[in-house]
Amino acid sequence: MTTGFLQKIFGSRNQRLVKQYQKTVETINALETQIEQLTDDQLRGKTDEFRQRVAAGESLDKLLPEAFAVCREASRRVLKMRHFDVQLIGGMVLHYGKIAEMRTGEGKTLVATLPVYLNALAGRGVHVVTVNDYLAQRDAEWMARLYNFLGLSVGINLSGMEHEQKQQAYASDITYGTNNEFGFDYLRDNMVYETEARVQRALNFAVVDEVDSILIDEARTPLIISGQAEDHTELYVRMNALPPLLERQIGEEKADGTGVEKPGDYTLDEKSRQVFLTESGHEKAERLLAEWGLIGEGESLYAPQNITLMHHVYAALRAHTLFYKDQHYVVQNGEVVIVDEFTGRLMAGRRWSDGLHQAVEAKEHVKIQSENQTLASITFQNYFRMYAKLAGMTGTADTEAYEFNEIYGLETVVIPTNRPPKRIDKQDQIYKTAKERYDAVIRDIRECYERGQPVLVGTTSIENSELLSHLLKQAGLPHEVLNAKQHEREAAIVAEAGRPKRITIATNMAGRGTDIVLGGNAEKQAAFIEADEAIPADEKARRIKQLHDEWETLHEQVKAAGGLHIIGTERHESRRIDNQLRGRAGRQGDPGSSRFYLSLDDPLLRIFAGDRVRSIMDRLKMPEGEAIEAGIVTRSIESAQRKVEARNFDIRKQLLEYDDVSNDQRKVIYQQRNELLEAHDITETISAMRHGVITEVVRQFVPEGSIEEQWDVPELEEALRNDWQLDLAIQEMVNESSSITADEILDAVTTAADEQYEAKVAMVGRESFSAFERSVMLQTVDRLWREHLAALDHLRQGIHLRGYAQKNPKQEYKREAFELFAAMLDAIKQEVTRIVMNVQIQSPEQLEEAAEQIEERTGHLENVEYQHADYAESGAPVANVAAATAATATADMVGSAMTHGHAGELPKVGRNDPCPCGSGKKYKQCHGKLS
């Protein structure tokens, strides 16, 4: 109450910020007359003047009013577009490292030019980040005219570009590209073997378009560069036969033994997208696997030698029960292609991890591709937090303002619209069944079509869009379908979606980034005429004028019919996605309307609010085909959405807390790697490693400060001879001296190792040997880092089970991850020293050949896959994602953990310990019974 009272007096934080920026807008407007007087050359010359002032120490904040005024005038001359006052406010919000929420059609692309121009003056590079290559190329080509006029260079960073093109793009003042490509370039730069092979500069300032999509929707999806690992193709095929033989259990067993409506072999948790085998399911699976000869008679699935099978059992079950064709993936050209659940786009080339993709391929009877090993990975959360300054813009950020602030330290500022909005958002209509809902949708579309009003229908999946398309064909209504299967055409379809009688079906936010203009997009058609050299100039002018006249008529016709009407056929889990769909109507003060049609069969209602709404409908005795339209139901749905949003936020936050551990380690490894690349001579580093390793070896057999009776000299001699190529008669030294100490033995071995090393260097020359050492060290760091990443993933998969032992899983993860990291650093020293001391050299040519072989073995950038696999989607390590993942560690994982000193063997489970399956029961009452 007090807060509301104070807000009335002082205004909200948002209002105060906008008011503050308004004063700067007045300063910019006061400069307009003066700037208008400048010639084109004088206006262009302002850029050099500003650069000199920045170099002399003037801050960008102080330069802002003049730079914005110059950019606005240049835009007016080059693009024939003058920034509105609210767009200047948006530009300031971005410059100060905040998120600008601007409604659809308010000109976000133009707004970005202001802070981008200002920050590019510092000469440290500015990245403009978009969601796909099409938008990156479109915006770069469109705005390059303005930036080039002002004397700034513009680069485009697209996937598949040549190395030199990428370097050129990053060297430009302003670089446009996609979030994926910027992230992958960062990872690739930290996998190179020469400094000249890197493409990125230091990460200075990024403006992220559709910031909610990139920093929130995709925050759970790490970028992964991976290579092929061991082949388990045959096992996936055989496991694919298992799920059809198992039955789903309906209902969860309670403590008193009740709650199961229909017994079965597995249960599903649709919220967390996990599957769990029941006791009978385990018994049945073990019996079938024994019949197929995959496990021994009477063996348990939890036996150490069978853990890899457990991984395959769960992968096959999840593929059959939780992932559906044309909803989560499509089969195209004999390949399983993932569908992005947020945009409905196909994500070609991306694969689910943890064997799920192979299990889906086995289910669809297409060629099974090998499992991959992670070579490098980073989340968008940790990548974008590396920028010195980060800003973003979107039409819908306010519902996620808390998360932006909590995770990225970004404040959200809602920018006022240039004209007051006129869109009417109607109440949701809820039907009992999906059929009744679709009947109502078709009726609404027909009414709009008959009065000449354009309609945009939003669906949540390709399957639903094709179903609706089929129903519209039956109803004889012409329409366009915009989904992941046709996104080459999407910009063209969206541009024309505002014409009279136009019906467009779109999955979620396909076509996002392209405005729907009432009456159609005359500018696009005019551009085609302008580009046609066969048409004479006067004919071009006549046709373009005719186009604009026709557009004026159509524009008024659509406005009179009520503007664009938005129909949502289902509520999304996130209110923000619903708001994005609604936001396509009512741009720049145009009329428009929106309505959502729901049914009790929708996943959101069924899982979170179905019983409550169904009881309301039953009490009201609703006849078939009748909808419920009430505020209480809409509020109930929004409450369900808030629950899902809160849960997703918790998952993202938890993922970040766990990823921060590997991120800190990643920074250390990448920093050391870069120092290694840039160092002219690494002799001192190699020497320190050698002395450290030799000391460890000697101390193992001749402990420091010990007496002769405690020494094991024969074993030391054998270890030095076999492992380090040092043939020393230490026993003779001991026999000849009555007072030799442990330190003197260490000095003797160290001196011998140094002499052996110097002899090799003298044979081939310091420069050649140093190049060989660098290759060895880089290859070793990369290989052990890859194994370490796998070990961290596998540690994270089972770490939540520590909660049953009254331990904090996060603290345990941090502690064990640190131990793994320390073990990896020791392993790097051991491995590098072993290779350098064991290499046999006769000539410099032989050394070069050895270095080439090492680099060939590490030619990982030639045969890799770039994935953006959703961890939470694929059951990968989010700490509290269902306990069943505890059992999905493969035999490789165990081997990897053992290599890193994580565990000597798989721990034996005590009868009274919590069962490893995560049921919460004691082992003797759960899978102990099965063993």
Swiss-Prot record:
E.C. number(s) listed in UniProt: 7.4.2.8
Binding site for ATP: 87, 105-109, 515
Cofactor note as given: May bind 1 zinc ion per subunit.
Record has S-adenosyl-L-methionine as a keyword: no
Matches recorded under Pfam families: P-loop_SecA, SEC-C, SecA_DEAD, SecA_PP_bind, SecA_SW
Biological processes per GO annotation: intracellular protein transmembrane transport; protein import; protein targeting; protein transport by the Sec complex
Any Gene Ontology CC annotation: cytosol
Keyword ATP-binding: yes
UniProt name for this protein: Protein translocase subunit SecA
Coiled-coil positions: none
Cofactor: Zn(2+)
UniProt lineage: Bacteria, Pseudomonadati, Pseudomonadota, Betaproteobacteria, Burkholderiales
Positions of disulphide bridges: none
Subunit structure, as described in the record: Monomer and homodimer. Part of the essential Sec protein translocation apparatus which comprises SecA, SecYEG and auxiliary proteins SecDF-YajC and YidC.
Keywords for this protein: ATP-binding, Cell inner membrane, Cell membrane, Cytoplasm, Membrane, Metal-binding, Nucleotide-binding, Protein transport, Translocase, Translocation, Transport, Zinc
